[in-house]
UniProtKB/Swiss-Prot annotation:
EC category: transferase
GO molecular function, one term: nicotinate-nucleotide-dimethylbenzimidazole phosphoribosyltransferase activity
Residues of the active site: E311 (proton acceptor)
Stored Pfam families: DBI_PRT
Taxon lineage: Bacteria, Pseudomonadati, Pseudomonadota, Gammaproteobacteria, Alteromonadales
GO biological process: one example: cobalamin biosynthetic process
Entry's EC annotation: 2.4.2.21
Source organism superkingdom: Bacteria
Family to which the UniProt record says this protein belongs: Belongs to the CobT family.
Name the UniProt record assigns to this protein: Nicotinate-nucleotide--dimethylbenzimidazole phosphoribosyltransferase
Catalytic activity: 5,6-dimethylbenzimidazole + nicotinate beta-D-ribonucleotide = alpha-ribazole 5'-phosphate + nicotinate + H(+)
Gene source species: Shewanella loihica (strain ATCC BAA-1088 / PV-4)
Protein's UniProt keywords contain Transferase: yes
Amino acid sequence: MFEVTVVSSEFDAKIQQKIDTKTKPLGALGALETLAMTIARVLGPDKPQITKPTLLVFAGDHGIAASGVSIAPSEVTTQMVMNFLKGGAAINLFCAQGGITMEVIDCGIAQEIHDQPKLINHRLGAGTGAIHREPAMTLGAVKQGFAMARERVALHHGRGCNLIAFGEMGIGNTSSAAAIMAALMGREAAECVGRGTGIDAATLARKQLLVEQALFLHREQLGDPYGVLACLGGFEIVQMTGAILAAAELKMLVLIDGFIATAAALAAVTIAPHARDYMIFAHESGERGHKLMLEHLNAQPLLSLGLRLGEGTGAALAVPLVQAAATFYNEMASLEEMGISI
C-alpha cells in the first residue's frame, strides 16, 4: 500500500564533513549533530530548510475504557477535543508558541461533535470494540484509516510542509498501545502496561490483566501488523500509523511524540522498515514500556522531561530543536572560513 524508499547514504560523508568542520570541536553540539545528519539525509545536503511544521492530533475512543483502565471516563475524549478546538489545551499553546500548524481529526470518538468546521471528520466508528472481548475493528477499517491519513498528509505536503508530527487523544489508548507493543515486540504485558493517566496499583493490575486477555484472545491474528492493528488498535493509532507511512513515502521528516505515537511508529516500521529512516523521536515519556520501544527502534530521543500527557506535546516542544539543528548546519561558519585551528 505504501512505497517507502530507503534514505540514500550517498552524501553521508559530505554531510558529516560539513558538520565536523563548523567552528566548534568535533561532536560539541552533541545530539544536534546527529539530528542535523538526519535532516540533511532526508531533505538533501545543500541547505535543507524546515518548512511549515505541522502537527495533526488524532482522536478516537476505546471500548476497553468502559472496563476502568483510566482515571477518566471516555467522555473526556470528546471534552478534550472541544478543548483543542477552543485553543485551551497544552498542545494549542505549544504549537502557537512554536509556529506550528495544528489540526484536530476525529477518527472515531464515541460522542460525535457537530457544527465544528475546524474538526476534520475521519470517523471510522463511534469508538473501537473492547479488545479483551472482540477485535477493535475490521481489516477494512484499518485500510480505510490508512487511506484517510494518506490523503491528509498529502494535503499538507502539497502546502509545503516537510516536517510533520502527530499527537493523539483517546481515553484508554495506552492500553491499546501497550497491547500493540507486546504483540509486535513479543513482550509480556507486564513489560508494556503502565500507569497512563496516573492510575493506582489496583487499576494497573486490572489494565494488565485485560491486555493479557486481549493478547490471548487474538493470538491467531497477531502474525502480521495489519492483524495487530485490527485486533488491538485504536482508530487514532491506525490513522497515525498510516500518516507516518504516508509522510515517509513523501520523504518528509516525521517527528514522533511519546508512548502512543511510538507504538504507531513501531507498527509503521513493521509494515515498511525504511520508514524508520525518516523518523525523529521527540522525547522519552514517563510511561512504562516507552524506553523499551525506543531501544527496539534504535532511537535516541531529543528530550527527557517525564511527559505523559500525550496530545503531541513532546513533539511540539522538540520542533525548535529540529529548526536549530537545520540552522546550525546551514548557517554556522566553518573553521576554514574563520581561520580557526582546532
